[in-house]
Amino acid sequence: MRRGIRNLSPLLLLLLVVVTPGCEDLPAAPNIPPTASFIFNPVSPINAGETPVSFNAVGSSDPDGTIASYVWSWGDGTPEQSTTSPTITHVFADTPVRCVNVVYAVLLTVIDNEGGNGSASQQATVTEVPIAGSAQCK
C-alpha cells in the first residue's frame, strides 16, 4: 500500500496545481496626487532685475510615491522653469514703472512619479528701484 501512495503523490500534486486557481491581478490603487508647498526668501524688499530670490519646495510631498518634477511659473513674463530639485533661485524681471510695487503670483506645480500633480501659489511683491542718481522713491 505504501508503494501505491508513493506512486500517486506526484499525480495528486500535479492535479492540485492544475485545479488550484492562479493568482489574479488586483486592481491598481488609484494615484493620490502630491501636495505642493513652498517658501521664499527674501520676502521683502524684492528689487526687480536685481534681487535673487530663493524658493524652497522641500515641504511638498507625495503620500504614495515621489515627486518627479517641480514646475515654477513666476508670473513676471519670464518662461516657466522645470527642475527635479525642490530649490531654485529667480530674479524677477524689471517692471514697467519705477517706484511702484508690482504683485506677481508665483505658481508651483509638482508632478509625481505617476503623473499626478498638485499646485500652490503665493504672491511676491516686487519694486523697480530708481535709476542711480535720480530722485528716490517716496
Locate the predicted segments by residue.
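Bacterial N-terminal signal peptides
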Residues: 9-20
